[in-house]
Design a protein with these regions (language model features):
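Outer-membrane beta-barrel proteins and related beta-barrel translocases across Gram-negative bacteria
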Residues: 1-215
């Protein structure tokens, strides 16, 4: 796949950022190990950043051409149990990522990580860099449904482990650390009229909540 976009931004009358970003991706089809049901997917991603800045901290005043790459292996193991009135699904999953190149400094960016975006390739919402370093994202999804009453319970947990701290990753996400927060969520539909959503993050010492919210 190929995608390209560009921008020319003027801030504070004298700060200029010009960029053209080209993204290439190659994904190999899932390989299913039928004996155990393990699904694997391997992706190779390339980013070509052409940039020029004036009075800007991230981009130099002379034209720059940068090439970045990212390798990712995703695996999950769906486990399903069915009864007459209920279904139970348990999915352990992980993502291994490696970026041999550096990234732009986004340490001060505002970004909240949760169970909905922690496995996203661009989980920081940035377009000029891939996430730097080695990381392993580990998670588990559980879902149970009552087929006759249309009620269900969904639970998700995930965390990120890396080999060393990364100074340019948004610090408020905690993913810059060797061990990130533990992210979790619950979606509980008691009936057609009552539904409870709960999201939370526990710090990497597991002794306090970084955030929690009910929806």
């Amino acid at each position: 796949n190929f995608a390209s976009k560009g921008s020319n931004i003027l801030d504070n009358t004298n700060n200029i950022k010009s960029r053209i970003i080209n993204d290439f991706s190659f994904n190999f089809n899932d390989k299913i190990f039928e004996n155990i049901g393990l699904r694997n997917n391997f992706g190779i991603y390339f980013k070509n950043l052409n940039s020029l800045g004036k009075n800007d901290e991230k981009y130099k005043s002379s034209p720059q051409l940068e090439l970045q790459s990212l390798l990712e292996l995703r695996s999950d193991l769906p486990l399903i149990k069915l009864t007459e009135n209920t279904s139970h699904t348990l999915i352990p999953k992980f993502s291994l990522r490696f970026n041999p190149s550096d990234m732009k400094d986004h340490s001060g960016d505002e970004r909240r990580i949760n169970t909905d975006n922690v496995f996203d390739l661009n989980r920081f919402g940035i377009d000029d860099s891939f996430e730097s370093g080695y990381s392993a994202t580990v998670g588990i999804d559980y879902n149970t449904k009552n087929l006759s009453e249309e009620s269900y319970l969904e639970l998700k947990l995930a965390t990120v482990i890396r080999d060393s701290e990364e100074s340019k990753i948004p610090t408020k996400t905690s993913l810059n650390k060797k061990n990130s927060n533990l992210f979790g969520s619950m979606d509980y539909k008691i009936s057609k009229l009552i539904n409870i959503d709960y999201d939370f993050a526990i710090d990497n010492n597991y002794d306090k909540f970084e955030y929690n919210s009910f929806g």
